[in-house]
Structure formats: structure tokens, C-alpha cells
Amino acid sequence: MRTSFDVIVIGGGHAGCEAAAAAARIGAATALVTHRFATVGAMSCNPAIGGLGKGHLVREVDALDGLMGRVADAGGIQFRMLNRRKGPAVRGPRAQADRKLYAAAMQIAIQGFPNLSVIEGEADALLWQDGRVSGIRLGDGREFAAAAVVITTGTFLRGLIHLGERSWPAGRIDEAPAMGLSSSFEALGFKLGRLKTGTPPRLDGRTIDWSAVEMQPGDDPAEPFSVLTPAITTPQIECGITRTTPATHEVIRANVHRSPMYSGQIQSTGPRYCPSIEDKIVKFGDRDGHQIFLEPEGLDDPTVYPNGISTSLPEEVQRAILKTIPGLERTEMLRPGYAIEYDHVDPRELEPTLQTKRLRGLFLAGQINGTTGYEEAAAQGLVAGLNAALSAGGGDRAVFDRADGYLGVMIDDLVTRGITEPYRMFTSRAEYRLTLRADNADQRLTDKGLALGCVGVERSAFHHDKMAALSDAKALAQSLSITPNEAAKHGLALNRDGQRRSAFDLLSYPEIEWAQVRAIWPELGKVDPAIAVHVEIDAKYHVYLERQTADVEAFRRDESLGLTDVDYAAVPGLSNEARTRLERHRPHTVGQAGRLDGITPAALGILAAYLRREQRKRKSTG
């Protein structure tokens, strides 16, 4: 077996799979280290991909030729576009997935890279020399050399499961944790913290009274995540919706002292936006019910995931809770819910490439950086894998900023501000939402992926054809024009100002849709419907996009002012507080400095003026 690689990726979850695949696409000799190949691509918690903000990340991973979108399309059994009634900028594609189909599709994808080897075993220690990573050691003593290592351990890093009064070391239920790597991090001086997450009990769907719950169908037709998926062919299912009751809340209140979160057994912080059911009852006790989504875990699997009742209460209490919920009174619990604590690294220890500042060649992605969610992990994995391969090969860095995409927003939030709780992506975190839409991820990022060398031949050809078709369709819509009087004959009420308006102009009106302009100009009928959607969205947002483009240009000017080698003690006019914060965090740019707490606009002005003076000095002496 080969013992030396360009890149080694530790962990076969969503971050690890994307990291290994990204490194392999760049051409790096890559190894993926995992306890068992059978668990690669496993969905540890909810059987779903995407959602608000998260769906944007999946589309961005797909735009860079990542795996998650295509794998979700292969395993998806219910697709829904969330926020469909709102504007395109905040719509979120989501898919319920068959766990077995998803994992199988991911494993096939991983096996499809000839330069990607899978090594089964537990990574026990990092190896390094002269400030740079040199490889890893497994628990069985085997050593593997590498120019770059990506760690994506998820909840396995010194993982500890809690169920009622019991607790035991584990990375997932019935799977061993990764214990040795934490010692390596501590030996290197990394600041480690503890976070917590949880999962609900699993139910036998054959024992649920489906007639007592509301049924929720998916979209028809289903809209795929990946632009390379022509249509969804997997059979589609419905999900159920029920609610907790006052009786449920009484059971929880009577036993909340037995919850590890409230007994003092768990001290770490859990995800704010995915609270346990006991947290909901304690913090929102005035509500008469909390919604529960009953999500089947597979087409041929009776297991149902009750989304909304994550808990670590004792098993007998969980059974008592289920008996109080409509439709679940006689359900059989296949596996209890539980909470899990795990180590994470302070993400402020990272560069925007996700390389650590302390050890060159070491990259981190996923929950180890303090995030929560499959999609957040996948996006980080892709960025870390790209940069690990580029680092190993002596290439340029792959950095995505806040105007590039949600993956840039997330990484900047992490490395600039750090975290106090598990980080989850929302559309509200992005300043440039109008340009960072789920529908245009490929238009924003695929060209950048092509330049980096991570986009394959199939996507490259598809992207070229799509962009040409979009350009032609937009040009056609802009070339066709009509007067207000002529428009009135077609039922369109425009201001009678005598000005001709193009089809593109008409589409900018909120009440005018593509079908109406196509009825006026039959030649628009030759435009592919998928392309027409993009033209209409671009028209609707046209004026706002022009304004946001100016904002992005100003942002990029600040991002171009580098601070890497600045001696803040030599910058006159800075307050002691600003100087201390800048020294502590060492931001890369003036833009990043502005996103630190306590750095005022005045301090930014002083920094910008100082940099301009230094630049003039270098030019005059150069």
C-alpha cells in the first residue's frame, strides 16, 4: 500500500468527502482516512440536505464541481423550494433524502477518483517537523506522509454521548470517538473548546397513525440541486406534520432535572437554532405546542426521523413524551435521542484558506471549526481540500470573500469573529443577498472553479453552453421593444410617456412575467424555460443589482488593502483598545479589520491612510 500522499483527509463525513474529492479534482494524490468505508457519506442526524441559507451552500458546492448536490439529487425522496412565495434571493432548495441511497451515491463518487485512496483506521496523531505538517499516525501504528492534512472529525473529536444520567465516549451512536488527535492539537498550542449537539429518537413508521397527522407533499416537478441533473428520477414521498401538546410539556417539566443540559452534566453550548425539546419547553413555556416534522429515512426503511424533538432525556421519559403526541401514541421507538459533546478548535486560529496559523499544511473543516450542519461542513471541506492540494503543489490560494458566495461569508465570519455557539448559515448573514442567490451560484463561481482547476470537462462544457444561451436570451429580450400604446393592446398598463420599452424592461415590472412578454414576441418562445427564469430574475433585480455592484466594489477596495505585515505600534493615532484588538486578531485586510468588534470607522480611516502613506514611500524609494 502507498504510504506517501500529497493530501491526507481525516474523516469521511460531508466535509471529508468534499475535501478529498476537491483535492483529487485538482490532481493531488489523495488519501481519505475513515474508521470504516461503509460509513462514508453517512447522515448522522436529520435525513435532509439544504434549506434556507444551507441550500445556497449546496448550490455553491455544486458550482465548484463538488459532490453534495449531485448526491442529494440521487438520494432525494422529497424536494421543496422553501420561501417560494418570497423573492429569489431568499429561496432555499431542500431535499429529504434516503439515507442508504445518499451514502451509496457518495461512496460511488469517492471511488470514482483514480488518484483517491481510502484507508480504514483511526487517525491517532499528527506528525510535524519545522512548523509544517508531515503526516499522520494511525491507532494501529501505521504512519503516512503528506504535504498537507485536512482534519474533518465532526463530532468524533473526544466525543461524549449523553442519555439521561448516562454518558460514554463515542463519535456517533455505536461508533468510537477520535481521542488522540485532541492531544496533538493541545501539544501544538491550539485553543480547544467544547460544543454540544443532539438528535431525536428514531421511530418505526409502521406504528405511526398517519391518519392523525397532516401530510406534506413535495414540489412537482422536483427541482434538482445540481445543474448537471436533468430531472429527479427517484420515487417521491410525503412527510407528516404533528405537534406537541400540553400533556407533552407536563411530562418534560416533570423530568427536566434528568436532562443532562439541566442537571449540570453538560456544560457546553448547543446550537441556538436547533434547540432540544426540553429547551423549547423551558424557554418558550407559554406556547401550547411545537411543530414536529415526521421525515421518513428511506423508501424501503420504516425508520422515521421526528424533526423537532431532539432530546437527551432518559429513554423511559422519551417514550412517555411520544405517547402524548397526536399520531405517535402507539409508536415504537427504535432508538432513543441523545446529546453529544465534542472538541472544536477556535476558528480564529485559521487563515481564510482554512489552513491553521500555527502549523503550515494543516487544514480544518466542518464541526471542528465550530459549525453545525451538513451543508456548512461540505462547503468548508471543499475550500480546505482545494487549498490543501494547491498548498501541496505550490499553487495559488483559493480564497472566497463575502461577495463571492455564502461559503465566503461563512468562512469570513468564522476566521474573523470566531464562535460562541455552533454556527449555522442563514441568508441574513450575507450583505449582498441580491447577488448571492441560489439560482445563480454557477454564474458566480464556476468560472473561478475553472481557473482553479477543480471543474471537470462535463461541467465546463455545460457552463459554457448555458452562459452563451443566457447571454443570447438577454440580448434578444433587450432588442425587442414596444410603445406604451402597443403594450396596452396586450393588456399591459404602462405610463403613457411615449418611451419605448424593451422586453427586458417590461420584465423588471413586478407584475409582468415571462409568459406575458413571450405572448407579445413569439421569438422569445425559442428560449429554454430554464434560461428564461434567469433572464426574468435578472430583469426584476436589475436596478438593485447595479446599486449592490457599487457596494461590492467598495467592499473589494477595502479587501485589497492588506494588513499582513503591519506593525500596529507604528501606526499613529490608533487608540490603545484598537491597537490591542488588531494585534490579537491580526486581520488580513482593512475590510476584515472592520468586521472585528471594537474597531471603529475612525480606526479604519487611520489604517487606510497609513497604508496609503506607506505605499507612497515605497514608490518614491523604489
Swiss-Prot record:
Location relative to the cell: Cytoplasm
Gene Ontology BP term (one): tRNA wobble uridine modification
Protein name per the record: tRNA uridine 5-carboxymethylaminomethyl modification enzyme MnmG
Lineage: Bacteria, Pseudomonadati, Pseudomonadota, Alphaproteobacteria, Hyphomicrobiales
Cofactor(s) named in the record: FAD
Binding positions for FAD per the UniProt entry: 11-16
Top-level taxonomic group: Bacteria
A GO term, aspect molecular function: flavin adenine dinucleotide binding
Subunit structure, as described in the record: Homodimer. Heterotetramer of two MnmE and two MnmG subunits.
Annotated GO CC locations: cytosol
